[in-house]
Amino acid sequence: MEVERDQHKPPLSLQNNKIPSSQNFPVVDLSNTNGELVARKVAKASEEWGIFQVVNHGIPTELIRRLHKVDTQFFELPESKKEAVAKPANSKEIQGYEMDDVQGRRSHIFHNLYPSSSVNYAFWPKNPPEYREVTEEFAKHAKQLAEEILGLLSEGAGYLMKINYYRPCPEPDWVMGIKAHTDFNGLTLLIPNEIFGLQVFKEDRWLDVDYIYPAVIIIIGDQIMKMSNGRYNNVLHRALMDKKKTRMSSVVHIKPPYDMVVSHFPNSPAAIILPSSSL
């Protein structure tokens, strides 16, 4: 089947030019008992990269495995079954299943997770049967992790979950999984499957993110960048397709309410963060 190419001119040429790996990609160990040191490492990573991995984050590895299993089982269902929880056509509703391209190589499903009043189970798959149980258990752990990182900044925030699914693509040089962007929300928690394709833009080049399973990748969004008056970096990133294998990622977006006006903290943008000079 011929690939419907994105409008890239020239192509990405990923197979011909080795994109350098981010060998110094920041990793933060949340099991460290020195809370001040952990906070400084998070601040430093947010300033310099706008993205980092956390290990020993409290989300059980077995739960991550079960989450990827039920997500894969859903996306491998016939299209007619997935359409039962599809996002309504021409609707402003964000929740539900949606195919991103006519050839079915890119698709996703959105769920609101928090607050509970925003959750609409009509858009939650009933097949596989364990989908809701596993997703809700993961949501509890994801909320705890987000609050640990954000502290009081996460109070009153909404939690939106998205599962991205990218089928193998014969010409990955020509088709982008997700085009380069920054996240509009405050904070993103991302857990990929074993086929990883996330890249970040730093120092005028794209870098592969060296993923450490089962770490959680933390991405600083536009709202945190604005609240910190630019000290924290809203990183530009993108996702690639794979020629032979299916890629999938489970993503939780933490966002302020839609009617909230977001602004930087007055007087001193450093008031909410610890200095990193002693690292």
Curated annotation (Swiss-Prot):
E.C. number(s) listed in UniProt: 1.14.20.6
Domain Fe2OG dioxygenase per the UniProt entry, residue ranges: 156-256
GO molecular function terms listed in the Swiss-Prot or TrEMBL record: flavonol synthase activity; metal ion binding
Disulfide-bonded cysteines: none
Domain of life, source organism: Eukaryota
Enzyme kind, highest EC tier: oxidoreductase
Record keywords: Iron, Metal-binding, Oxidoreductase
Biased composition (Polar residues): 13-25
Residues holding 2-oxoglutarate: N164, Y165, Y166, R247, M248, S249
Cofactor note: Binds 1 Fe(2+) ion per subunit.
Residue span of region Disordered: 1-25
Family assignment from sequence similarity: Belongs to the iron/ascorbate-dependent oxidoreductase family.
Catalysis performed (reactions): a (2R,3R)-dihydroflavonol + 2-oxoglutarate + O2 = a flavonol + succinate + CO2 + H2O
Gene expressing this chain: FLS4
Pathway: Secondary metabolite biosynthesis; flavonoid biosynthesis
Protein name: Probable flavonol synthase 4
Residue numbers binding Fe cation: H181, D183, H237
Organism: Arabidopsis thaliana (Mouse-ear cress)
Cofactor: Fe(2+)
Pfam family, one: 2OG-FeII_Oxy
